[in-house]
Amino acid sequence: MPVLTIGDRFPAYELTAVVPGDLKDIEADRPEDYFTTVSSTVPEGTWRVVFFWPKDFTFVCPTEIAAFGDPHEDFKDRDCEVVGVSVDNEYTHYAWRRSHDKLQDLPFPMASDLNRELTEALGIKRATGEADRATFIIDPHNVIQSVSVTADSVGRNTEEVLRQLDALQSDELCACNWQAGAATIDALGQMG
């Protein structure tokens, strides 16, 4: 199945996830207390960044997951929810978060697509069953506005994800290397 692309509707999902927040601050008697359900149903006007990594307990993946947490307030300021997903189960996510210093306090849920339905529907499921390293920016109408898939050895750049989100939310023509606050392209003025 080909990767869903710009203009396609993002598939509906309901996934079990490890709750956001500092795991040390959560009062829980058992691992299940650390789990929640995340879905594609979001408040009106909300954008989403849904990013996938191939596998827990690897090397590049935790650097990306932590990096997506760093600009959390920037995403919130843009009315954008962030959800991280892999095909590992929620117990594996929980164990990884507990054991990795940079993952213990994440401001977004780590979701499990254990049955691989979402991964497959998006066209990012590998023959080995893992998800590709993929990022989707989804507008408030549930339409994919940006897709990026990178090699396992290459981590993503969250500043670039924010830049793309700014450009998409500007609803203007934005030149290469455009940054929020910079002038956009006046196509009508150029056609003159």
Regions found by a protein language model. Name each.
Residues 1-192:
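Chalcogenol-based redox active-site neighborhoods
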